[in-house]
From Swiss-Prot:
It is an enzyme of class 3 (hydrolase). This is Glutaryl-7-aminocephalosporanic-acid acylase. GO terms for biological process: antibiotic biosynthetic process; response to antibiotic. Its main location: periplasm. Residues 188-198 form a propeptide. Its EC number is 3.5.1.93. GO terms for molecular function: glutaryl-7-aminocephalosporanic-acid acylase activity. It comes from Brevundimonas diminuta (Pseudomonas diminuta). The keyword Signal applies.
């Protein structure tokens, strides 16, 4: 039973970041207590949740199950409706609960065996970790039982949830959204919220910092509107472990995590862990090695909710080939999907063991289990070790490069059927490189540090592409390689970089050509671009025009190479492409961009932040930062402008944390869209003004910090 006690909040000492322009020093508040606090975490003697002024739960448990229970209770309070909907979907009952809009997801999950496999995986958990999963689910149920009016009637039917539901949601998210997805298998392509995943990560060794302390950046970029990509900030403390950070809602472990000893972060990588096999149908079966094989067939069914609230049973025949489950595309072709890692139930426990490791050796032992199916993972600790791993369950393939395996692979020959996967040591990794840092911004794993320590020739060509690194990824390498003696303050300033690297690479050729064009409007635009500091700041008057020109020059996603004078090269991965191949064509594109900018925004010199707005509830503030493919390290992807030329973020910076492994640890960060989306919450729009100002708040780990900031206490008792 939980009860909630309210009291007036004490004054909260926040970190304040001052200034947006490059070169302006970032000033932080003094630490809230004297340095040299002991590394040992506070050891709770009772179970309670202390809520700070931003709705962050600081969960103190007398043991691990108690902390997991409190974590489930806190997530339900902050995101209960969305979590229950996600759990209902992962159960394979979305169509039954909510109707036709969920039918495709239901069929996708049932055909791939997700609900059934989740039950098996739940049974295969270690007893201790299964108890943690049960406790997390019990916390969700307890909150809903104690606060029934706070849960939407639409999702109450999902209750109660179980530890198996927790596993099912994680399994669906990792294996059947990140690794395999319905859009890729059905040939429709991923929707933007799934296709545009991204993140930034840095880890810096002590020798590259001013104070001799390692530094870590956590910075995922995902959709702001998609439930399963919504992040949640929390702090868990027991006598045996401490974890602070953020993770997607519904997950019982924190994936972007740190404590007084170490931390990790993740970025989406391009590992191809799923293969779509194109089948040749014949005589009711499929061709394989010159013979017709029958499909394995299994009869199943699901219920579909009707408009009047009734349900009808829908039969579902599940066909499988030797490769895996079979799906029919809209054009009538049959495709079988084979997903690596479906024999590995331990992803959640591996993450938990990674983020509670007592040494780098312990961390490596957890990583070597290879239960986490994808992601680049970056590590740093207070002893000074840093590591980058191109992690994932990667099939061993006899031939073909990554482009071949990303496509529709012939399914009529056993030569393409993979049955084994690579161990961790086969994958691109680097520990404590000479350059003193590791990084990843969703680029292929060939420049995780600078100078590089390995090349693509050291690895199979199907592991990762040798394709152009984005300008954001190039900027990531340069921001780290060109800065030494880093303080936490300077580290934070670099994270806020919103320089238009593409402008640096192209304007020296475009501007002179435009200045001699006879069109006065083109000349005026050239002068505007020449006066621009090439930063996506809120007061920039040329950024919108440049963005429109760059879309014509480099394509809709700003990733095209053909128009550059010098294209990208693996030999010069952080300084190419550059130059304008055809200045006359580029000037004509500028002429078109002038018209497009006027049509969309009313003028070519409208301030960037006047059009790019951060709007949540009744908060409406100017935005800064731009598209990663234009070179902005700090990323926001903007919606199409409305009739007033106003656009808002649809994707980009969500959680950001910058950590110094000092004694005690210092950390600052923000959750762009707040820490709750339940109806009536005050913690949805309460951080967006700080995002606009890059005004990072101190993240509170030490008990005395939390006590000084507490707004509400929730004592609880938990008995398994």
């Amino acid at each position: 039973m939980l009860r909630v006690l309210h009291r007036a909040a004490s004054a909260l000492v926040m970190a304040t970041v001052i200034g947006l322009a490059p070169g302006v020093a970032f000033a932080l508040a003094e630490p809230t207590s004297t340095p040299q606090a002991p590394i040992a975490a506070y050891k709770p003697r009772s179970n309670e949740i202390l809520w700070d002024g931003y709705g962050v739960p600081h969960i103190y448990g007398v043991d691990a199950p108690s902390a997991f229970y409190g974590y489930g209770w806190a997530q339900a309070r902050s995101h209960g409706d969305n979590i229950l909907r996600l759990y209902g979907e992962a159960r394979g009952k979305g169509a039954e609960y909510w109707g036709p809009d969920y039918e495709q997801t239901t069929v996708w999950l049932l055909t791939n065996g997700v609900p059934e496999r989740a039950q098996q995986w739940y049974a295969q958990q270690s007893p201790d970790f299964r108890a943690n999963l049960d406790a997390f689910a019990a916390g969700i149920n307890a909150y809903a039982q104690q606060n029934p009016d706070d849960i939407s009637p639409e999702v109450r039917q999902v209750l109660p949830v179980s530890g198996a539901d927790v596993v099912a949601h994680a399994h669906r998210l990792m294996n059947f959204l990140y690794v395999a997805s319905p859009g890729r298998t059905l040939g429709e392509g991923d929707p933007p919220d799934l296709a545009d995943q991204g993140s930034n990560s840095w880890a810096v060794a002590p020798g590259k910092t001013a104070n001799g302390n390692a530094l870590l950046l956590q910075n995922p970029h995902l959709s702001w509107t998609t439930d399963y990509f919504t992040y949640y900030e929390a702090h868990l403390v027991t006598p045996d472990f401490e974890i602070y950070g953020a993770t997607q809602i519904g997950l019982p472990v924190i994936r972007f995590a740190f404590n007084q000893r170490m931390g990790i972060t993740n970025t989406v990588n391009g590992m191809v862990g799923a293969t779509n096999y194109r089948l040749t149908l014949q005589d009711g079966g499929y061709l394989y090695d010159g013979q017709v094989r029958p499909f394995e067939r299994r009869q199943a069914s699901y219920r579909l909710r009707q408009a009047d609230g009734s349900t009808v049973d829908k039969p579902l025949e599940i066909r499988s080939s030797v490769h895996g489950p079979v799906f029919e595309r809209a054009d009538g072709t049959a495709v079988a999907v084979r997903v690596a890692g479906l024999d590995r139930p331990g992803m959640l426990e591996q993450y938990f063991d990674m983020i509670t490791a007592h040494s780098f050796d312990d961390y490596e032992a957890a990583m070597a289990r290879m239960q986490v199916p994808t992601f680049n993972i970056v590590y740093a600790d207070r002893e000074g070790t840093i590591n980058y791993s191109f992690n994932g369950v990667a099939p061993k393939r006899a031939e073909g490069d990554i482009a071949f395996w990303q496509g529709n692979v012939p399914g009529d020959s056993s030569r393409y059927l993979w049955t084994e996967t690579h161990p961790l040591d086969d994958l691109p990794r680097v520990t404590n490189p000479p350059g003193g840092f590791v990084q990843n911004s969703n680029d292929p794993p060939w420049t995780p540090t600078w100078p590089v320590t390995y090349t693509p020739r050291d690895h199979p060509s199907y592991l990762a592409p040798q394709t152009p690194h984005s300008l954001r990824a190039q900027q990531s390498v340069r921001l780290m390689s060109e800065n030494d003696d880093l303080t936490l303050e300077r580290f934070m300033a670099l994270q806020f970089s919103h320089r238009a690297v593409m402008a640096d690479r192209t304007l020296p050729d475009l501007i002179p050509a435009a200045l001699i064009d006879p069109d006065p409007e083109v000349q005026a635009a050239a002068r505007l671009l020449a006066a621009w500091d090439r930063e996506f700041t809120s007061d920039s008057r040329a950024a919108l025009l440049f963005e429109e020109w760059a879309r014509l020059f480099a394509g809709q996603n700003f990733a095209g190479q053909a128009a550059f004078a010098t294209p990208w090269s693996l030999d010069k991965p952080v300084s190419t492409p550059y130059g304008v191949r055809d200045p006359k064509a580029a000037v004509d594109q500028l002429r078109t961009a002038i018209a497009n900018t006027k049509r969309k925004y009313g003028a070519i010199d409208r301030p960037f932040g006047d059009a790019s707005r951060m709007i949540l509830n009744d908060v409406n503030v100017p935005g800064a930062a731009g598209y990663g493919n234009l070179g902005s390290f700090r990323v926001f992807t903007w919606s199409d402008p409305d009739e007033n030329g106003i656009r808002t973020p649809v994707h980009g910076e969500t959680w950001v944390a910058m950590i110094e492994f000092s004694t005690p640890v210092r950390a600052y960060g923000l959750m762009s869209y707040g820490n709750s989306r339940q109806p009536g919450t005050t913690h949805y729009s309460d951080q967006i003004e700080r995002v606009s100002r890059a005004d990072f708040r101190e993240l509170l780990l030490r008990r005395e910090q939390v006590e000084a900031a507490v707004q509400e206490r929730t004592p609880f008792n938990f008995k398994p």
